[in-house]
Amino acid sequence: MTVRNLEYLFRPASVAMVAEPDEPSRYAEVVLSNLAAGGFSGPVMSVSARKRPLIHVGHDVRLGEFEVAPDLAIIAASLDLVPSIIAQLGARGTRAVIVGPWMWHRMSASAIDKARKAIREAAKPNLVRVLGPGSGGLVVPAIGLNASATPVPITPGKIALVAQSTALTAAILDRANSKGIGFSTVLHLGSDLDVDLADVLDWLAADPDTHSILVQFDEVSAGRKFMSAARAAARNKPVITIQPGPVSGRHEGSGPFSTADVYDAALRRAGWVSINTLGDLFEAIEAMARIRPLRGERLTILANGHGLGRIAGDTLLRSGGELGSL
């Protein structure tokens, strides 16, 4: 589906929280607190439950309390309730939802699969875009949108961070905060039932607030779609990824992206830069935060040796560049 209706996810004019009175409600309370702290200027719609404004839903879900349809809804509810919530939101005009964490241990594998299919069917009639289930949320600091449970303040910047690992996302945000590095977008994918990495890359490639993209992922579900988006993103701005390695369950020959070598070759061909360690990752983040767009077509090379300068100049010319002079 690519970027259709993603403007309601990344640039919503209004937000709503939908939660049930259970463990996920704590997540909902933190997200609402972050929305308030981030300074989101649009309405955050809700009704009263507990001590914080939450939509209090049970198995008989009714969302008629909304005065207007929210562009974006954040859902913190059991997976079996999510299809009904999405159907009602979609009928009212909502076009994007974030489905947050839920209690995996309470559902069998078959029940989870059934719920995922039901979510797809509920979203389809009104073209509702679904981030998740299991997404840690989305942050767009420039518009004050912090629809996540992250405890770390995130300032505006020019780097987009897209990740599948919540732990690594937290580590990156903590390090960036200590260095005064900001982000244009921070997004945790969760399980890519609808909005996947390729969709997000297509959006970020055209986003004027994003100058570089940092990606962490374990696997992709649609290889051809992903590679098309990966190439398009790298044509527009630098893309860096922390190299995924072989993990349990991903064996040689199990698919087009079954080993670290295949990942690396595919990403290098797309124009991405792969790094292998957390140390390199943090150095890359600092470099990305400080790079500036090049102006003009020429490049002047300064070297402390004739041989090194000549190698650099030859590489530049072979790549279609033009040498400048002082």
For each feature predicted by the language model, list its residue ranges.
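Catalytic-core regions of core metabolic enzymes
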Residues: 1-326
